[in-house]
Amino acid sequence: MIIRFAVLLAFYFIGPPIFCQTTDRYTIIPRPAQLDPQAGEFMIDHTTAILVPDADVELKAIADGFAQQIHRNTGIMVPVKPASSALLPGQASGTNVIQFAPVRDSTLGSEGYHLDITPKLITVQATTSRGFYYAVQTLYQLLPPVVVSAGAKHIGSLLERNPSAQPPMLLALPIPACRIQDKPRYPYRGMHLDVGRHFFSIDFLKKYLDLMALHKFNTFHWHLTDDQGWRIEIKKHPKLTQIGSRRSETIVGHYDGNDPQVFDGKPYHGYYTQDEVREIVRYAASKYITIVPEIELPGHALAALASYPDLSCSPQKGYQVATKWGVFDDVFCPTEKTFAFLEDVLTEVIALFPGLYIHIGGDECPKSVWRQSAYCQQLIKREKLKNVNELQRYFIKRIDQFVTSKGRRIIGWDEILEGASPKLQLSANATVMCWRDIRGGIQAARQHHDVIMTPGQFCYFDHLQGDPQQEPTGFGGSLPLATVYSYDPTPAGLSTDEASHILGAQGNLWTEYIPTQQQAEYMLWPRAAALAEVVWTPLAQKNYPDFLRRLMTHFIRLDYLNVNYARTLFDVLPTAKPTSDGHLELRITPTDPAMETLTREARYTTNGTLPTSESTLYQNPFILSQSATVRTATFEMGKPISQPAKVEKSFIVSKATGKPYTLLNAPTSGRPDRNYSLTDGNTGSMGGYEVAGVVAFRNDFNLVVDLGQSETIERVRIGFLKYTARNLCLPKQVDISVSEDGKTFRPTLTAKTNAAEGGKRGFVRLSFDFGLTQARYIRIIARNVNYVPAGLRNPGKPAQLAVDEIEVN
């Protein structure tokens, strides 16, 4: 059966006739709380006017922005007029008008709106300007996608890619008739960006805010400081940017990617002046987005300590801005000098950011320095604290009191709940950001603290979104689109009162492995669109297949906005299983099973070359009779819709394929008893911290393969995962022997191998040639070096072997 993918490429330059023919009339993300389709459509043309209440400056600004966007991208000029003004020439009373009409309707809340779209009139109702703004975001998504375009330059690039398309100078824009009653499920709908690890430009921040607004997010969490960089100007303490915004170099690749670690030798720097911060705050406010700044404390403080060493417990120690990722022992020392410094910093931050919340971090604070510090031990005794955990709580409480005294509220990561005691209570209005798992959120809600949910398993967009082997270098962990969409921020088991403290959820983008704008967008979208629906749409209205349907048109909007969104959803992956005759049967399936319901066209090659529109069309499972590198991609109308250079998988066919084996030493991980995982033809994979398809051993690897009959053989190849940062070393020696009866074995080869080999992690296939011989059984013993050799990252630690596919020929 042919799999075809209808991605609606024709909608790039959609005109009214084509648009009217589509059945996907309503492709709004996030899905409205209630949408009732109606017959017909309203047409925006040169006779349309937008009417706003007289002298309502905020609504006029919203209407002006809407009209300007339409004119810029379509050439249609829509005047914005006071509601009391005369109609345009040729307009009948109450026709071809978009009417902004404020109402008093408690059911809409402060962010809800009502849209009534008929062929003659659009009525927009809301109780606040914020509600009107969100109504306009919905109108954008009811209009043809060209309306949201980033501008003429990008339209030109689209025309270059699609020369047959017509420039988007349209005579009329259709909006399908409907009635929408809409408001958000949660009051806090956030997205986050870490600029400490990698710095991002003002232009990118504005684009990020634009995309957030289109998806009705209302809070931007700006992570401004970390061990690897201090990114905000503090006038009273200029060394924070003179020194703390600069690092001498940056680790290359994954944290565990090389042993020893490799650095690029290139200085890295960047920070935002206070004027630039004000510019971003104003821009966000124009999008009805509040910014929550984060100043990390007491941990993640190396950039600050490099700038001002006397804020540490060991001022004489030399500190440098961190050049690699991770958690560092050096943290702020809880001295009065440190608190005075932090109050100075927070005073300037509070003056820059008018929002209610100040995020103070509070996560991942090692306490070894505090345990060894005579000052800290005296402070614990003086304040009658029990231990360093309570000392952290004391630190957080001091900052909490200061921020509260300024009329603001703190947000902290869920570690701020630790070290609690009757005299170390947080202020009642302290808000907990739950990141490690949902338990912190449950605990905080039951203590009557407000909670923002952002658990890593649902909301960490630095995690990989597809097959680890196929994705760019990332932190690790798996977070596909479907998992994001499945999230319910309100944990089960909370009472109604406790559940009321769950303010919403937030998507986080930590940027250790995200150095560019393009990669940031790749990691964010479309997963952020899924989260937008999680936090806006009523739980009962969520529907993942319907979300995917709407997402197909939404991708076209993102194309117009020049967003480098991930096309992982369109990936198709080859998988293999052995056949009874020693070959492999390959299937090509979507990464997301829900995509089976949408039509697509998958093509593949078996010689390692990039698939094209002329490559073999996948219709049914096919047979591999020899080893091959398979690459896959999806196409529509001859154009790739997945990334043709992305999906690549090697398969091995040999005389051992599908053959049973016996392990004489038990493994420590992996499932060698299931589907013959060492002889199933599938090679192992690795990405981030994720490893699949290998079997690990703390002792020697000792295996006997039964070929089923006597065969002429001359070579054995074994795959090993060399990952010395995780103590997975190559063997020190490999012994191979053969047998006809499985009882009496004769040695054929003993080979020394380099167990001390470090360098780049990855799979190493070692080949052992022993000349032509006849055998049914092959015994392979790979000798473990037992302890990590000197010269590697963890010398003396127990070593393991990780074995991949076995090949016999």
Predicted region positions:
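Bacterial Sec-dependent N-terminal signal peptides
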Residues: M1-R25
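Active-site neighborhood of glycoside hydrolase catalytic domains
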Residues: A304-A306, V321-T323, V327-A428, W435-Q443
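Flexible, acidic glycine-rich loops studded with aromatic residues
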Residues: I410-L417, P422-A430, C434-R587
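Surface-exposed loop/turn motifs at beta-strand-loop junctions within extracellular Ig-like
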Residues: T128, T634-G638, N784-N786
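Aromatic, loop-rich ligand-recognition surfaces of beta-strand-rich domains
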Residues: S685-L749, K760-N809
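Short, compositionally stereotyped local motifs that mark structural "simplifiers"
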Residues: C20, L51, K542, L548-N702, ...
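Feature activates predominantly on carbohydrate-active enzymes
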Residues: S106-Y357, R398, F402, Q506-T511
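Contiguous, structured surface segment used for ligand recognition
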Residues: Q21-Y186, Q519, V534-P545, R549-R557, ...
